[in-house]
C-alpha cells in the first residue's frame, strides 16, 4: 500500500500533481514576499524623499508633525476597527460552535436513550427524536433566506465601496483646485446602494475590487473574512488620517468671541468641534453597521443553511449579540440626529439662509426627539442584549407570560419612520399655513441673523460707506491734479497683450507666456522740459517667459532633454498699461533676450527703466507650468537662453534641489519618481541635484493643504537684500475658509468661483516663492482671524509675521481678485441691512455685463492707480474696483474699492451714487458707443477684409466727484492673432470721443482746440432722453 496519499511505487516522492501544487504554493509565497518588499520600499522611499524635500525648504518639523499625527490616527483607528470586528467575529463563531456542540450532544443522547416500545410482551430500546436547543426566532425557509442574504450582502458591499471611494478622494486631491481640503465624510446611508457605481470614474476598478472582496469574503466564510476586515480597517485608518487637521484644529481651537443666536455657542464650536464629531460619527456608523451585517450573515450561513434550504433560527445568545450591535448602530443614529440639529443653522430655504421659523418651532424639536428616540432604542436593544429576547411563536416553545408579539419587535422602527414622515409633512404644513401668510413677521428675527452673520463672515462690516455724486465738473486744472491717475488708465487688457507676446516675444517654440498680471512699479522718469529726474508709480502688465517642455519637438523629447537640458524659463516682459508703440503694438519697458552689451540681459526701453526695474539673470526654475522634475549640475549643460541662431548654456548655482550623492539616495529617488533611468545614467556627478515639485501651485498646496489658494499667482521682480541671484519672486494669496459659520449665506458663486463651498473667508496669508531657488515663505497678514491663529498655534515654525517680509516685496502686495470677487458678489444682496428692504429685495444690485470680443461677460474687477475721493487721501494709491448697477436697470448705482498699498491694505470703500439722478452705467455707455452712427460706421469698416474690431474692457474711473469712462478698441486679423490698439473711446458728461490715443481723446473733450486730427467727438444729447425714459 502506498505510505501516504498521493504516493505509490511509481512516485515514491509524491505525485507530479502534488509537486506542482507545492511549487505553486512556493511561487505564491514568493510573490507575496516580493509584493510586501516592493510596498515597503515604496513607503520608505516616499517618507525618505518627502523628508528631504521638506528639509530643503526648512519645514522638516512641519512634515514630521503631520506624519506623527497621521500615522498615530491611522494606527489607532485601524487597530480599534480591526480589533472590534475581529472580536465580534470570534464571539459569533464561538456562539455557532456552542450551538453545534449542543445539537451534537442532543443527537448523541437521542441515539442511546431507551424509549419503551411495546412489541408483543417485550420492550425494545428504540432511538428517540433528537431534542436540541430551542431557537428564539422563527426558522427561515429558502425562499426567504436566500433573498435576505443577497440583500444584506449588497448592503455590505455598498458600504465597503462607499468608504473606499471617499478614502480615495481624500488621498488623491486635485492640485488644480483652489482648495484641496477634503469635505467631512458623510456617514453611510442605504441610498448609496443604488448609486455605488455612479461617479466612480477612474476609481471604479478599485471600488469594484473592494466590493468583490466583500462578496467573496461573505460567500467563502472565515478564510477570507479576516483579510477583508484588515483591508477595511486600513481604509478607515487612512480615511481618518486624511482628515488629520480636524483633530488638530479641535485641540487648538481659538475663540471667535461671537455667539450664535440659537444655541448660544461660540462660533468656534461650529468651525472647530462639529466637523470632528461628524467625522467620528461617520467612522462609528460604518464600523458598527459592518459588524452588524457581517455577524448576521455569518449566522445566517452557518450550519449549511443554504445547502439545507432552511435556517433553524437565531439562538438566544445570538440574538443578544445582534442586539448589542444594533444598539451601537442606533446610538450612532442618535448622534447623527443630535448633530443634525446644528445643520439647520446652514439650511437654505430661499428667503432665509439658516434656521427659519419652521426649523426653530417644528423641525428642530422633532430632530431633538429623533435623537432621544434613537438613543432610547439603543438603550432598549442594550437591555435586550443583557436580559435576552423572548422566544418567538412558532419555535416549538411555550409562550411566556409578558412576551411581546412579533409586531412589537418592529414597533420602534415603525415609530421612527413615522416621526420622520411627520417631520416633513408638519414642516410643509407649518410653512404653508403659518409662515407664508405672514412671512415677513415670522421670519424677521431670522432674517436679521442671516444678514448679520453673512456680513461678519465675509468681512463686509468693515466697508466704509461714502457718497459720490458723479456730477462734478472736470477742468484742465483738475485733470492736471490727477495726471498720475490718467497716466495709469489701463488700455492694454491681459488677453490682447498675451496674444501679442506669443507672437513677438516667445522667441522659441518651447517658451510660453501663460499669464500676464497687473502690478505697479516705482520708476524713474525725466520731465520733458527739464533735466529733473523723479519717481512715479506706474501700473504695468508683467508676463513671465516660462519653459513649456510639451512644446519641444517630439523627436527631441528624450529623457536627457526633459530632465537635464530644458530646465528653466528665462525673462519676462513688462509693459505699461497706458502706452502704445508704433503700429498700435504694446510698448515694452522690458522685453527680448539679449542686448548688444550682454547676451543674457533683457532689453529695456531706457537707462532709467534699467535702473528702476531689477532684472539680473531672470531664470525661472519654479513657475506655473514647470511640471517636470529636473537634475542640475550634471555632465550635460543646461539650455540657458537662445542667442541669435545658437544657444547659450549654463549650470545651476542656486540653493534649490536635493543632492543625489549616494547610490541609496539615487535608488530611493528612482522609486519615488518612478524613473529607473536615474540609476543607469552616467551623467550624474557628486554635486548633482534633483529639483522636483517645481510647479508653484503644487508646491504650496503640498506644504499647507489646509489653506485655500488664490488662482492667480503673479510674478514680481525685486531686489532683496542678501540675495545675489534671485530677482524674480511669485506672490500668492491664501485664505482660511470654512463652511460652518451659522446663518452665513455662501451664495451661488460667480463666474470666477461657481458653486462656492464656503461661508467664511479671510485673506490671512501672503506666500512668497523664489522663482530661482524655490524657497517658500508664508506670511500672516490678518491677526484677527481665529482660523489662522489656530494654524499658527499648530505650526508656529511655518508662519512668519508680515512685518518680516522684505520691504521691496511689500510694495507689490495687492488685494486679491478672488477675495474681492467673493465679497463683491455677497455685497449685491447684503448691502441691504434693513430687514424690510432685504426681504423685498428692493435695492438688489447686480454686476453689469460688457461686450468683449463680441461676447457678453460680467465686468470683472480691475486695478487702478487713483486718489480716492471723500476720505482725505493724500496721494494716489493702487486699488481694486468693482461697479454695480440696480437689478432691473442699467444705470450706475455703486462702486466698491479695495485698497492695496501696505499702509491701507484691506480697507474697503463703497461709493454709492444718488438714485434720483441718472449716472450712466457700463451697459449704457457701450450702447451709446455702439449706436453712435459715426463710431459704429468706423467699427463696421474694421470688421471687414479679414479683420475684426474688439471692444476691450470698459473702465469706470472716478476722478474727484466725476466719472470718466474709457474703453479701448483693438484691431485683430482673423488669421494672424496680433491685436493692435486702434482707438480709445472716452465718455465724459454728455460727450463721447474716439481717438488714436487716450490723451487725444481726453483733449478732444476738454480742449476746445484739440491737436488730434483723427479724433471723433460726438454729443450724447440725442440719447439722454431715451436713457432717462428707461429709468422711469
UniProtKB/Swiss-Prot annotation:
Keyword field: Cell membrane, Membrane, Transmembrane, Transmembrane helix
Intracellular or extracellular location(s): Cell membrane
Membrane-related topology note: Multi-pass membrane protein
Keyword Cell membrane part of the UniProt annotation: yes
Pfam families: UPF0182
Keyword Metal-binding among UniProt keywords: no
Chief localization: membrane
Coiled-coil boundaries: none
Gene Ontology CC entries for this record: plasma membrane
Signal peptide positions (record): none
Transmembrane segments: 27-49, 69-87, 144-166, 197-219, 226-248, 283-300, 321-339, 364-386, 406-428
PANTHER family associated with the record: UPF0182 PROTEIN SLL1060
Family: Belongs to the UPF0182 family.
Name this protein carries in UniProt: UPF0182 protein sll1060
Highest classification ranks of the organism: Bacteria, Bacillati, Cyanobacteriota, Cyanophyceae, Synechococcales
Amino acid at each position: 500500500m502506498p505510505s501516504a496519499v498521493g504516493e505509490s511505487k511509481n512516485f515514491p516522492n509524491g505525485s507530479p500533481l502534488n509537486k506542482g501544487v507545492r511549487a505553486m504554493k512556493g511561487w505564491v509565497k514568493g510573490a507575496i514576499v516580493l509584493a510586501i518588499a516592493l510596498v515597503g520600499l515604496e513607503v520608505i522611499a516616499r517618507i525618505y524623499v518627502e523628508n528631504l524635500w521638506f528639509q530643503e525648504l526648512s519645514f522638516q518639523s512641519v512634515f514630521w508633525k503631520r506624519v506623527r499625527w497621521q500615522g498615530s490616527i491611522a494606527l489607532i483607528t485601524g487597530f480599534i476597527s480591526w480589533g472590534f470586528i475581529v472580536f465580534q467575529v470570534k464571539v459569533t463563531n464561538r456562539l455557532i460552535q456552542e450551538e453545534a456542540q449542543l445539537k451534537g450532544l442532543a443527537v448523541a443522547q437521542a441515539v442511546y436513550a431507551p424509549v419503551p416500545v411495546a412489541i408483543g410482551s417485550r420492550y425494545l430500546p428504540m432511538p428517540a427524536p433528537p431534542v436540541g436547543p430551542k431557537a428564539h426566532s422563527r426558522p427561515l425557509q429558502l425562499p426567504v433566506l436566500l433573498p435576505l442574504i443577497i440583500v444584506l450582502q449588497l448592503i455590505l458591499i455598498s458600504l465597503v465601496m462607499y468608504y473606499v471611494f471617499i478614502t480615495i478622494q481624500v488621498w488623491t486631491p486635485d492640485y488644480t483646485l483652489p482648495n484641496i481640503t477634503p469635505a467631512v465624510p458623510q456617514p453611510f446611508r442605504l441610498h448609496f446602494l443604488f448609486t455605488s457605481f455612479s461617479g466612480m470614474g477612474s476609481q471604479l476598478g478599485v471600488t469594484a475590487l473592494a466590493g468583490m472582496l466583500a462578496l467573496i469574503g461573505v460567500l467563502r466564510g472565515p478564510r477570507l473574512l479576516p483579510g477583508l476586515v484588515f483591508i477595511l480597517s486600513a481604509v478607515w485608518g487612512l480615511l481618518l488620517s486624511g482628515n488629520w487637521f480636524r483633530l488638530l484644529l479641535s485641540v487648538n481651537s481659538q475663540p471667535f468671541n461671537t455667539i450664535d443666536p440659537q444655541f448660544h455657542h461660540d462660533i468656534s464650536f461650529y468651525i472647530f468641534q462639529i466637523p470632528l464629531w461628524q467625522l467620528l460619527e461617520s467612522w462609528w456608523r460604518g464600523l458598527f453597521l459592518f459588524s452588524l451585517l457581517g455577524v448576521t450573515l455569518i449566522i445566517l450561513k452557518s450550519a449549511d443553511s443554504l445547502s439545507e434550504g432552511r435556517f433553524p433560527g437565531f439562538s438566544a445568545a445570538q440574538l443578544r449579540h445582534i442586539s448589542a450591535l444594533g444598539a451601537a448602530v442606533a446610538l450612532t443614529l442618535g448622534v447623527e440626529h443630535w448633530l443634525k440639529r446644528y445643520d439647520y443653522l446652514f439650511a437654505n430655504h430661499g428667503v432665509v439662509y439658516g434656521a427659519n421659523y419652521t426649523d426653530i418651532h417644528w423641525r428642530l424639536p422633532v430632530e431633538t426627539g429623533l435623537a432621544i428616540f434613537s438613543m432610547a432604542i439603543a438603550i432598549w436593544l442594550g437591555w435586550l442584549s443583557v436580559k435576552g429576547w423572548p422566544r418567538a411563536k412558532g419555535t416549538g416553545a411555550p409562550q411566556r407570560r409578558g412576551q411581546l408579539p412579533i409586531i412589537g419587535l418592529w414597533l420602534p422602527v415603525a415609530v421612527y419612520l413615522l416621526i420622520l414622515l411627520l417631520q416633513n409633512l408638519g414642516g410643509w404644513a407649518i410653512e404653508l399655513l403659518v409662515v407664508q401668510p405672514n412671512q415677513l413677521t415670522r421670519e424677521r428675527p431670522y432674517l436679521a441673523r442671516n444678514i448679520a452673520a453673512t456680513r461678519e463672515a465675509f468681512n463686509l462690516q468693515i466697508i466704509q460707506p461714502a457718497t459720490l455724486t458723479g456730477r462734478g465738473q472736470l477742468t484742465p486744472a483738475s485733470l492736471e491734479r490727477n495726471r498720475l491717475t490718467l497716466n495709469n488708465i489701463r488700455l492694454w487688457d491681459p488677453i490682447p497683450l498675451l496674444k501679442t507676446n506669443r507672437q513677438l516675444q516667445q522667441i522659441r517654440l518651447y517658451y510660453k507666456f501663460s499669464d500676464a498680471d497687473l502690478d505697479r512699479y516705482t520708476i524713474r522718469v525725466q520731465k520733458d522740459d527739464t533735466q529733473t529726474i523723479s519717481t512715479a508709480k506706474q501700473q504695468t502688465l508683467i508676463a513671465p517667459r516660462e519653459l513649456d517642455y510639451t512644446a519641444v519637438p517630439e523627436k527631441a523629447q528624450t529623457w536627457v532633454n526633459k530632465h537635464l537640458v530644458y530646465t528653466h524659463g528665462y525673462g519676462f516682459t513688462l509693459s505699461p498699461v497706458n502706452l502704445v508703440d508704433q503700429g498700435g503694438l504694446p510698448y515694452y519697458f522690458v522685453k527680448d533676450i539679449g542686448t548688444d552689451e550682454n547676451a543674457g540681459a533683457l532689453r529695456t526701453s531706457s537707462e532709467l527703466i534699467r535702473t528702476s526695474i531689477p532684472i539680473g539673470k531672470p531664470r525661472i526654475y519654479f513657475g506655473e507650468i514647470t511640471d517636470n522634475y529636473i537634475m542640475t549640475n550634471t555632465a550635460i549643460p543646461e539650455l540657458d537662453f537662445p542667442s541669435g541662431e545658437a544657444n547659450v548654456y549654463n549650470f545651476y548655482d542656486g540653493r534649490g534641489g536635493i543632492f543625489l550623492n549616494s547610490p541609496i539616495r539615487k535608488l530611493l529617488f528612482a522609486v519615488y519618481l518612478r524613473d529607473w533611468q536615474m540609476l543607469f545614467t552616467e551623467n550624474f556627478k557628486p554635486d548633482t541635484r534633483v529639483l522636483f515639485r517645481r510647479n508653484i501651485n503644487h508646491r504650496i498646496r503640498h506644504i499647507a493643504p489646509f489653506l485655500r489658494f488664490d488662482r492667480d499667482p503673479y510674478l514680481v521682480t525685486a531686489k532683496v537684500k542678501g540675495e545675489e541671484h534671485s530677482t524674480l519672486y511669485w506672490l500668492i494669496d491664501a485664505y482660511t475658509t470654512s463652511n460652518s459659520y451659522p446663518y452665513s449665506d455662501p451664495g451661488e458663486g460667480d463666474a470666477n468661483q461657481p458653486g462656492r463651498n464656503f461661508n467664511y473667508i479671510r485673506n490671512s496669508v501672503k506666500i512668497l516663492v523664489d522663482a530661482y531657488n524655490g524657497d517658500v515663505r508664508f506670511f500672516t497678514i490678518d491677526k484677527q482671524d481665529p482660523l489662522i491663529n489656530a494654524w499658527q498655534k499648530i505650526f508656529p515654525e511655518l508662519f512668519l509675521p508680515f512685518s518680516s517680509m522684505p520691504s521691496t516685496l511689500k510694495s507689490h502686495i495687492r488685494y486679491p481678485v478672488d477675495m474681492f470677487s467673493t465679497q463683491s458678489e455677497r455685497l449685491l444682496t447684503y448691502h441691504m441691512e434693513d430687514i424690510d428692504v432685504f426681504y423685498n429685495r428692493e435695492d438688489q444690485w447686480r454686476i453689469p455685463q460688457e461686450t468683449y470680443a463680441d461676447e457678453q461677460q460680467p465686468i470683472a474687477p480691475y486695478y487702478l492707480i487713483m486718489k480716492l475721493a471723500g476720505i482725505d487721501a493724500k496721494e494716489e494709491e493702487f486699488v481694486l474696483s468693482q461697479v454695480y448697477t440696480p437689478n432691473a436697470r442699467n444705470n450706475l448705482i455703486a462702486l466698491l474699492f479695495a485698497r492695496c498699498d501696505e499702509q491701507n491694505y484691506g480697507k474697503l470703500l463703497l461709493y454709492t451714487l444718488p438714485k434720483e439722478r441718472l449716472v450712466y452705467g457700463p451697459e449704457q455707455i457701450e450702447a451709446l458707443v455702439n449706436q453712435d452712427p459715426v463710431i459704429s460706421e468706423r467699427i463696421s469698416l474694421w470688421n471687414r477684409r479679414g479683420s475684426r474690431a474688439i471692444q476691450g474692457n470698459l473702465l469706470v474711473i472716478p476722478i474727484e466727484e466725476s466719472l470718466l469712462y474709457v474703453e479701448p478698441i483693438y484691431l485683430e486679423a482673423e488669421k494672424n492673432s496680433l491685436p493692435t490698439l486702434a482707438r480709445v473711446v472716452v465718455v465724459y458728461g454728455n460727450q463721447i470721443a474716439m481717438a488714436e490715443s487716450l490723451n487725444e481723446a481726453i483733449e478732444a473733450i476738454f480742449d476746445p482746440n484739440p491737436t488730434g486730427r483723427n479724433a471723433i467727438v460726438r454729443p450724447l444729447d440725442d440719447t439722454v432722453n431715451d436713457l432717462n425714459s428707461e429709468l422711469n
